[in-house]
């Protein structure tokens, strides 16, 4: 029987009333969890965070907030093996890919904990030097950085449910703002468990962390000018968020990370028999296969001198042929499946478009066989 994921809002875990969405194991298509946010009062969830989490965090110095980040990192790391297993179960990740996400999360929290410990022992951060404001030396001024009195709303992508959650939360908590995190529904199982751990360990002040598992519903309609939104995902969805009427009217700050475009460039002076050439091929293959290519830093363009095209194509095809694709729980598997059917459809559509302009040098556009 699949698990029923709960959101964590208003200081308590809540389940949606209807319209359950299913989370699957990408390897088997088995439903591993279901979730919904139907019936959850988004306005109340935000108000609870503003009225409880915000004041509690603002009372703390940067060093004290940094200490919380360190505690969060340690609490999650203590459950590392469990989190890695969930990453494979709901994300289709190999052990190595799961570590990339989970260890990235705890490492980021630890990094900002160390950084925060070097900042002010007060709740404020001085910005620049004291400036003379008039002829009299008695009139001086200085800028200070202070926390906003709202909620940091984080809408995250499906590919990094651990790291994406932690890297956004770390900077918000260090800045003295409560967090409402909404993971992509398809891979929310990992984030949900991380939140459960942090709540059980009582790491954060009440209201400093909220979780939505499922649709955001009318969440954006209840934001104020003191709230902020950080979104990772497609440019189209980012545009919809930026264009939300309430966000425009309230002047809500919105940060969007979307549709990265990355390249690997081989210089014209490169020797095809050199160690550096081999490294180039290995790194390109890694970017294609790590997390099945489902990451923002994946290489989309490989730029090589025309006279090296055949050599690079042959070497890259050989490198990819050695990668075993299959059930990520099995030994020797280097690449797991795509996360869901929509990702498969998107990849196949992309391949079809590319073949109008390019020639395939390895594989085909079918789903393919998986080692089990």
Pin down the residues of each PLM region.
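A conserved hydrophobic position in a structured secondary element of the catalytic/binding core
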Residues: 24, 233, 304
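Rossmann-like NAD(P) dinucleotide-binding subdomain of oxidoreductase/dehydrogenase enzymes
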Residues: 121-278
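Residue-level signal for inorganic ion chemistry
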Residues: 29, 65, 87, 176, ...
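Short, cationic motifs built from Arg/Lys/His that form the positively charged side of catalytic pockets
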Residues: 62-65, 182, 301
């Amino acid at each position: 029987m699949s698990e029923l994921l709960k959101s964590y809002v208003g200081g308590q875990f809540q389940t949606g009333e209807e319209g359950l969405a299913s989370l699957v194991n990408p390897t088997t298509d088995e439903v591993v969890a279901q979730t919904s946010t139907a019936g959850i009062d988004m306005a109340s969830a935000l108000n609870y965070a503003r009225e409880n989490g915000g004041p509690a965090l603002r009372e703390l110095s940067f060093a004290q907030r940094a200490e919380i980040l360190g505690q969060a990192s340690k609490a999650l790391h203590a459950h590392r093996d469990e989190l890695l297993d969930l990453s494979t179960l709901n994300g289709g990740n190999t052990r190595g890919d799961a570590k990339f996400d989970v260890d990235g999360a705890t490492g980021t929290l630890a990094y900002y904990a160390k950084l925060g410990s070097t900042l002010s022992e007060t709740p404020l951060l001085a910005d620049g030097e004291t400036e003379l404001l008039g002829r009299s030396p008695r009139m001086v001024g200085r800028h200070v950085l202070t926390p906003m009195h709202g909620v940091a709303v984080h809408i995250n992508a499906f590919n990094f449910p651990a790291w994406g959650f932690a890297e956004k939360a770390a900077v918000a908590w260090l800045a003295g703002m409560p967090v409402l995190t909404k993971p992509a529904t398809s891979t929310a199982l990992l984030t949900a468990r991380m939140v459960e751990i942090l709540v059980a360990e009582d790491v954060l002040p009440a209201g400093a962390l909220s979780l939505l598992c499922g649709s955001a519903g009318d969440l954006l309609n209840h934001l104020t000018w003191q709230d902020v939104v950080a979104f990772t995902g497609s440019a189209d969805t980012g545009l919809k968020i930026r264009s939300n009427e309430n966000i425009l009217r309230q002047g809500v700050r919105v940060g969007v990370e979307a549709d990265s475009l990355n390249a690997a460039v081989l210089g014209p002076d490169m020797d095809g028999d050199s160690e550096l050439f081999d490294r180039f091929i290995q790194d390109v293959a890694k970017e294609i296969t790590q997390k099945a290519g489902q990451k923002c830093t994946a290489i989309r363009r490989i730029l090589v001198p025309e006279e090296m095209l055949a050599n690079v194509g042959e070497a890259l095809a050989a490198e990819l042929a050695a990668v075993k694709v299959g059930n990520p729980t099995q030994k020797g598997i280097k690449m797991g499946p795509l996360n869901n059917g929509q990702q498969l459809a998107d990849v196949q559509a992309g391949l079809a478009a590319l073949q109008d302009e390019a020639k395939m040098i390895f594989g085909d556009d079918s789903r393919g066989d998986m080692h089990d």
